[in-house]
Amino acid sequence: MNATTAPLPYSAARLHELAHVLIANIRELAHAGWTPATSSNFSHRLDEQHAAITVSGRDKGRLVEEDIMVVDFDGLAVGRPLRPSAETLLHTQLYRRFPEICCVLHTHSPVQTIASRLYAGSDVIRLEGYELLKAFEGNTTHETAVEVPVFANTQDMQVLAAQVDALLDKQSMWGYLIEGHGLYAWGRNMAEARRHLEAFEFLLQCELELLKLRGTRQVVPVPHS
């Protein structure tokens, strides 16, 4: 470092560590087909003021350490003048609001995207009675329901972030869908965020399969004699 180079406002060693954690997990999600055509974005809390996040437009199955950048919680690049995802604010709003959240994952699997289109008019997908509901942190029984919000897609991230914040004021959430887009899920660490993401994927797929099996028929309870 020369005399004119300012020190980084974050730990380079910690960034190096998190970059490898992110890349390994993102590669697995890419190989599963959840990040097509350079889509999706992923982040991890770096410290109390910064997050490590994927650089915009990079192939998620071929990431290298240089494809992980740093942003502050206003979504601005720190350190290197790279372009973060346009959806960075949807990550950083969670880090600002919840100090315990340390990882945010956003994917575009076919299941997530189709579900977001089918249920857009309902504004929510209600998941009820599944054993796998216990995968969500704090749930201890299948005898409960989890509502997955479906937000309208918009290019204005300030508007979408405000809508997410308004709903977070009213209820606990582990994730949400954006119409015609994909799924956001988060957790206190990468393992928990992955668990939530995978649980949503499985449960949404179950709901889509049930719709196909039921067709347009309405299930009418049989009266007991």
Swiss-Prot record:
Cofactor: binding details: Binds 1 zinc ion per subunit.
One GO cellular component, as annotated: cytoplasm
Pathway: Amino-acid biosynthesis; L-methionine biosynthesis via salvage pathway; L-methionine from S-methyl-5-thio-alpha-D-ribose 1-phosphate: step 2/6
InterPro entries for this protein: Aldolase_II/adducin_N, Aldolase_II/adducin_N_sf, MethylthioRu-1-P_deHdtase_MtnB
GO-annotated biological processes: L-methionine salvage from methylthioadenosine; monosaccharide metabolic process
Co-factor requirement: Zn(2+)
Enzyme class: lyase
Keywords recorded for this protein, A-Z: Amino-acid biosynthesis, Lyase, Metal-binding, Methionine biosynthesis, Zinc
One example GO MF annotation: zinc ion binding
Pfam families: Aldolase_II
Positions bound to Zn(2+): H106, H108
EC number(s) stated in the UniProt entry for this protein: 4.2.1.109
UniProt KW Amino-acid biosynthesis keyword: yes
Swiss-Prot/TrEMBL catalytic activity: 5-(methylsulfanyl)-D-ribulose 1-phosphate = 5-methylsulfanyl-2,3-dioxopentyl phosphate + H2O
HAMAP family: Salvage_MtnB (MF_01677)
Role, per record: Catalyzes the dehydration of methylthioribulose-1-phosphate (MTRu-1-P) into 2,3-diketo-5-methylthiopentyl-1-phosphate (DK-MTP-1-P).
Family named by the database record: Belongs to the aldolase class II family. MtnB subfamily.
Protein name as annotated: Methylthioribulose-1-phosphate dehydratase
Organism of derivation: Xanthomonas oryzae pv. oryzae (strain PXO99A)
Gene name of the record: mtnB1
